[in-house]
C-alpha cells in the first residue's frame, strides 16, 4: 500500500528522466507496474501503514549520501519558510543514512513542500516527501521509577 501511495511520484520521475536526452542518446525508462513482483492477492494482504496526520514536520527519504542538511534546506526553502532541516547521518562514517527531516513554519508551507518535492530529483536521486509520523515507543521499554533499581547490574 505504501508503494501505491508513491506511484504518482515515481511515474513523474520516470517521465522526467525519459524526456531528457543523455548525450546523443535517449534513456529508455518504463513504469514497472506491469512487472509487479507481488501478486494482486499478496498486495491486498499487505497491511497498510496508517497515514500520518498533517504537521509542519516532513520525513524525506531517498536522499543521496552526498546530500547535506544545508542542501536539503535549500531545496525545500523555495516552497516556504524552513525552520529546520536535518539529514540523519551515520555516527561512525558521517555519511547520510538516506533520509532526513524538514520542519516548516506553517502547515501550508509543509503541504507546498510535499507537493513540490515528492518524486523530484535532489543530488541525482529521486526523493520522497511525506508528513512525519511520531516515533512509537517500543513495548520493551517501560519507564520506571529511578529509585527502584540501579540502571546497570554489575558483578555482585
Swiss-Prot record:
Query: Is Repressor among this UniProt entry's keywords?
Result: no
Q: Report the protein name in the record.
A: Organelle RRM domain-containing protein 2, mitochondrial
Record keywords, A-Z? Mitochondrion, mRNA processing, Phosphoprotein, RNA-binding, Transit peptide
Residue positions where Phosphoserine is found in the record: 64
Give the organism the record lists: Arabidopsis thaliana (Mouse-ear cress)
One GO term in the molecular function aspect is: mRNA binding
Oligomeric and partner information: Interacts with RBG3/ORRM3. Binds to RBG2/ORRM5.
> InterPro entries, alphabetically?
Nucleotide-bd_a/b_plait_sf (IPR012677), RBD_domain_sf (IPR035979), RRM_dom (IPR000504)
- UniProt lists compositionally biased (Polar residues) regions at 137-148
Name its cellular compartments: Mitochondrion
Gene encoding it?
A: ORRM2
